[in-house]
């Protein structure tokens, strides 16, 4: 699958997911996840941050980690077209690749 198919970019679709999507909170990681099934044949991802999340370098690193973990778990989501939005709230949070990978594993089981 091409990289551009993974990203969720339409403002209208993003607002629809925030309104109609299922909310899952991960209180130990200070992050929320919104998910909703879509009309496409593949799943898409968006990682967004609160305004209190400072530092573009750290923000982009966390975004890259989420996208890579999602890309690796994409074959487990085959047949289930889902739009997923992660909202990260705390910039002092120490998100490692392994914690994000385990989060994606649990996501696949939940969905």
Swiss-Prot record:
Enzyme Commission code(s) on record: 3.1.26.5
GO MF term list: 3'-tRNA processing endoribonuclease activity; ribonuclease P activity; tRNA binding
Q: Which reaction does it catalyse?
A: Endonucleolytic cleavage of RNA, removing 5'-extranucleotides from tRNA precursor
- Claim: Plastid is one of the keywords in the record: no
Gene3D superfamilies in alphabetical order: 3.30.230.10
Keywords attached to this Swiss-Prot or TrEMBL record, sorted alphabetically, are:
Endonuclease, Hydrolase, Nuclease, RNA-binding, tRNA processing
Stored SUPFAM superfamilies: Ribosomal protein S5 domain 2-like
Q: Tell me the Gene Ontology biological-process terms attached to this UniProt entry.
A: tRNA 5'-leader removal
Task: Give GO cellular component annotations, separated by semicolons.
Answer: ribonuclease P complex
A Pfam family the protein falls into: Ribonuclease_P
UniProt xrefs under InterPro entries: Ribosomal_Su5_D2-typ_SF (IPR020568), Ribsml_uS5_D2-typ_fold_subgr (IPR014721), RNase_P (IPR000100)
Q: State the protein's purpose.
A: RNaseP catalyzes the removal of the 5'-leader sequence from pre-tRNA to produce the mature 5'-terminus. It can also cleave other RNA substrates such as 4.5S RNA. The protein component plays an auxiliary but essential role in vivo by binding to the 5'-leader sequence and broadening the substrate specificity of the ribozyme.
Q: How does it assemble?
A: Consists of a catalytic RNA component (M1 or rnpB) and a protein subunit.
Protein family per UniProt: Belongs to the RnpA family.
Its recorded name reads: Ribonuclease P protein component
Q: What would be the name of the gene that encodes this protein?
A: rnpA
């Amino acid at each position: 699958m091409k990289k551009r198919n993974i990203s969720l970019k339409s403002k209208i679709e993003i607002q629809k997911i925030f309104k109609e999507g299922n909310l899952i909170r991960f209180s130990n990681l200070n992050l929320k996840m919104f998910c909703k099934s879509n009309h496409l044949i593949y799943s898409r991802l968006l990682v967004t941050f609160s305004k209190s999340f400072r530092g573009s370098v750290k923000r982009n690193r966390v975004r890259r980690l989420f996208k890579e973990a999602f890309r690796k778990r994409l074959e487990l989501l085959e047949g289930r077209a889902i739009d997923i939005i992660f909202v990260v709230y705390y910039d002092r949070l120490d998100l490692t690749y392994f914690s994000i990978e385990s989060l994606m594993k649990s996501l696949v089981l939940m969905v």
